[in-house]
Regions:
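Gly/Ser/Thr-enriched, mixed-charge loops and adjacent short helices
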Residues: 14, 18, 34-39, 43, ...
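Short acidic, glycine/serine/threonine-rich loops at helix termini
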Residues: 100-105, 130-134, 152-158, 179, ...
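Phosphate-binding and adjacent anionic-ligand microenvironments
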Residues: 290, 294-296, 316, 336-522, ...
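An N-terminal, well-structured beta->alpha segment
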Residues: 7-106, 198-228, 238
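N-terminal small/polar loop signature for handling phosphorylated ligands or for N-terminal nucleophile
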Residues: 90-153, 249-309
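Conserved phosphate/anionic-ligand binding catalytic regions in large, soluble enzymes, centered on
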Residues: 39-59, 146-149, 234-246, 302, ...
Length: 560
């Protein structure tokens, strides 16, 4: 069916007033490309679930695409039941527009299919969903979130019984089930209140959240308590309750919350891109820092799985990168656990192929087996699962992604800004007793192991034409691999689609350059972007940064 025919079908079938208004606005715009973009494909379900722009259409996040996906999941769960009791589902949602509506839509569809769901009664962080899926023994977890995307987006992440985002085999099976569902005629549903009354939609009790916070607290390091002043912003998301509770539990009570970003608000009125990686999102927090002079600024993204920090350096506040915080945390956790006698024999840490190489000498310093996996925290969770199968999960000490995601402990199998915030504050308190802040501590590591600079440059390609351009860029690199970049010889070209080092196939290309420099290119798994990762090494910070500028300019030529 072509886009205009699909549009006409939706006009006939849709009864939701907001979606009806959206459909009407499309027609009144007089721009056929608007209709085409909303209907040229069905929102793709993958290992990251669904993610897309809110609105009417098959390529949009709405109650019909959510209903279709949930019906597919219900069919998958019931198909696994083998005439027994079907598995249950844990459901969580963030502060985004329609997140609660989509969570209740999912619970209603599951209920109509005879499947019980456990739903958080209020918004909670992503790691609380990963934990609840495991704690409640659920077959599937559903988290309605689009992480740190702009406000026009929402998403629908799916987790397996281990608390990890689903593997490709399960995603493929669910996709097959979804594709056989007509989103208007085949989706079984019932009112959420009726699902509750029938005992099929059950609110998660407070004891589950308490158990999650207990598990987070178990990862604290023993240290002398001392004063620490923190400015914290949840960026209008889910982090406020859990982060402040865990900080108070470790004795950090001097917490100044950024008022205009404290309440859940899916419009994200203070920053269009609520991403703790970027300075714009932290400007309100930095303004408060100028008034109260804290030891550090903490910022969690809307679903509180990522955390960014800033600390004072001279007259300004410096943002530390995800790689820098990951290296600092690895060093701190290993140092403290070694001093406390709790570092396990043959400890294991995990990061991804796009994270800094600076972790390698730091890990070696403590005798840590540093493992690298593909991008996506589920692969870090997979290493934990492998250790668990060998009855060795206590060997896992830390995992991180360069995109500001960290995990200590095995209570969750996704990145956890709650446990990371706790450990960052403990780390800041430790260095404060030495007369340093975290920025200064990072400079010490650079001086010890060399100045590594890492930079991620993203190129956006919207719509159907953008998807074709992204595919063309990757095909071009494969068909004619670069022999040099900005005059630096490519010493090794790796195509992860062919399998590298025993890792699963992935649409990632790596160019290893002379003198320890590197460029990696991959399409984002959650946004219409191509990401270029730059890794440079220099005898000074400025030298490494200048080289990254040169490589960035050279790669920009190909992003058209």
């Amino acid at each position: 069916m072509d886009c205009r025919s699909l549009y006409d079908l939706w006009c006939e079938k849709v009864t939701d007033p907001e979606l009806q208004a959206d459909l009407k606005a499309m027609d009144e715009s007089g721009d056929e490309a608007v209709i085409e973009d909303a209907f040229y494909r069905t929102l793709e379900f993958g290992t990251a679930g669904l993610r897309g722009v809110l609105g009417a259409g098959t390529n949009r996040m709405n109650i019909h695409t959510v209903g279709q996906a949930t019906q597919g999941i219900a069919d998958f769960i019931n198909g696994q039941a083998n005439d027994g009791e079907p598995g249950t589902v844990a459901i969580c949602y963030d502060s985004r527009i329609n997140s609660q509506l989509f969570a209740h839509t999912a619970a209603s569809v599951l209920a109509a299919n005879g499947i019980k769901s456990y739903v958080y009664p209020r918004l909670q962080p992503t790691p609380a969903l990963s934990f609840a899926t495991r704690y409640l023994g659920c077959a599937i977890g559903i988290n309605v979130t689009a992480s740190h995307n702009p406000s026009k987006y929402n998403g629908y992440k799916v987790y397996g019984p281990d608390g990890c985002q689903i593997a490709s085999e399960i995603a493929d099976a669910i996709t097959q089930a979804i594709e056989s569902v007509d989103m208007f005629d085949d989706v079984r549903t019932m009112p959420f209140e009726d699902a509750q009354a029938a005992g099929f939609a059950i609110y998660i009790q407070e004891e589950v959240l308490d158990a999650f916070l207990d598990a987070v607290y178990d990862q604290h390091v023993e240290q002398e308590q001392s004063d620490l002043r923190v400015v914290y912003t949840p960026l209008n998301g889910t982090g406020l309750e859990c982060v402040t509770r865990i900080l108070e539990r470790i004795g950090v009570t001097d917490i100044h919350v950024v008022e205009e970003q404290s309440k859940p608000d899916g419009n994200f009125p203070t920053c269009p891109y609520p991403n703790p990686e970027i300075r714009e999102a932290l400007e309100c927090g930095i303004a408060l820092c100028e008034q109260v002079h804290p030891d550090l600024l903490l910022a969690t993204d809307p679903d509180a799985d990522r955390v960014g920090i800033a600390v004072k350096d001279g007259d300004d506040y410096q943002l530390l990168s995800g790689n820098e915080v990951g290296v600092l945390l690895l060093d701190f956790i290993c140092r403290m656990r070694k001093e406390n006698g709790t570092l396990p024999e043959h400890p294991v840490a995990v990061t991804t192929i796009v994270s800094t190489s600076l972790v390698d000498p730091v890990a070696a310093k403590y005798g840590v087996d540093m493992r690298r996996v593909l991008t996506g925290f589920k692969y870090i969770g997979g290493v934990i699962a492998d250790l668990e199968q060998q009855d060795e999960k206590e060997r896992f000490v830390f995992g991180f992604e360069e995109s500001y995601g960290y995990l200590a402990g095995t209570h969750a199998r996704d990145k956890d800004a709650v446990v990371a915030s706790m450990l960052i504050c403990q780390m800041a308190r430790y260095y404060r007793t030495l007369g340093k802040n975290l920025y200064q501590a990072m400079q010490d590591i650079y001086r010890e192991f060399g100045f590594h600079h890492n930079r991620t440059v993203s190129y956006a390609f919207e719509g159907s034409a953008g998807a074709e351009t992204m595919a063309s860029i990757m095909t071009g690199f494969r068909s004619q691999p670069l022999s040099e970049i900005a005059g630096y010889k490519v010493e090794q070209f790796l195509d992860y689609q062919q399998g590298v080092g025993g890792l699963p196939s992935a649409n990632v290309l790596e160019f290893d350059l002379e003198k320890g420099n590197k460029v990696i290119v991959r399409p984002s798994g959650t946004e219409p972007k191509v990401k270029v990762y730059l890794f440079t090494v220099g005898e000074s910070a400025s030298e490494a940064e200048c080289l990254a500028d040169v490589l960035s300019s050279a790669m920009a030529v190909f992003m058209k």
